[in-house]
UniProtKB/Swiss-Prot annotation:
A motif (Required for PML-NB formation) lies at residues 17-21. Interacts with CBX4. Interacts with PIAS1. Found in a complex with SAE2. Interacts with UBE2I. Interacts with SP100. Interacts with HIPK2. Interacts with DAXX. Interacts with PML-RARA oncoprotein; PML-RARalpha outcompetes PML for SUMO1P1/SUMO5 conjugation. Highly conserved among primate species, however is not detected in mice. This is Small ubiquitin-related modifier 5. Cleavage of precursor form is necessary for function. Ubiquitin-like protein that can be covalently attached to proteins as a monomer or as a lysine-linked polymer. Regulates the life cycle of promyelocytic leukemia nuclear bodies (PML-NBs). PolySUMO1P1/SUMO5 conjugation on 'Lys-160' of PML facilitates recruitment of PML-NB components, which enlarges PML-NB. SUMO1P1/SUMO5 also increases polySUMO2/3 conjugation of PML, resulting in RNF4-mediated disruption of PML-NBs. It comes from Homo sapiens. The gene is SUMO1P1. Changing I95T: Does not affect nuclear bodies formatiom. SUPFAM superfamilies: Ubiquitin-like. There is a cross-link at G97 (Glycyl lysine isopeptide (Gly-Lys) (interchain with K-? in acceptor proteins)). Residues 98-101 form a propeptide. It is found in: Nucleus. High expression levels in testes and peripheral blood leukocyte. Expressed also in lung, placenta, liver, spleen and thymus.
Length: 101
């Protein structure tokens, strides 16, 4: 047996991991929880859009955070280092405000 036959292709294994589905927990301000199954390479814009449709609110009315950092539409679970059962927190977007004098 040659060395080429004995070694698995690491390139192929890397692709398999990237295409793997993970389950993410999305928790709203009211403590409601929805589970989503997504691929590691899928932009999280799809998850955000789906969550907002289920809640009946516009996407731009909510902000999504992972480990305290805002999630951009083009972020993927792979880029953010997400793992199985990780939590995404959802908050109402707050704009403006002013001080009282």
């Amino acid at each position: 047996m040659s060395d080429l036959e004995a070694k698995p292709s690491t390139e192929h294994l890397g692709d398999k991991i990237k295409d793997e589905d993970i389950k993410l927990r999305v928790i709203g301000q009211d403590s409601s929880e929805i589970h989503f199954k997504v691929k590691m390479t899928t932009p999280l814009k799809k998850l955000k859009k789906s969550y907002c449709q289920r809640q009946g609110v516009p996407v731009n009315s909510l902000r999504f955070l992972f480990e305290g950092q805002r999630i951009a539409d083009n972020h993927t679970p792979e880029e953010l280092g997400m793992e199985e059962e990780d939590v995404i927190e959802v908050y109402q977007e707050q704009i403006g405000g002013h001080s009282t004098v």
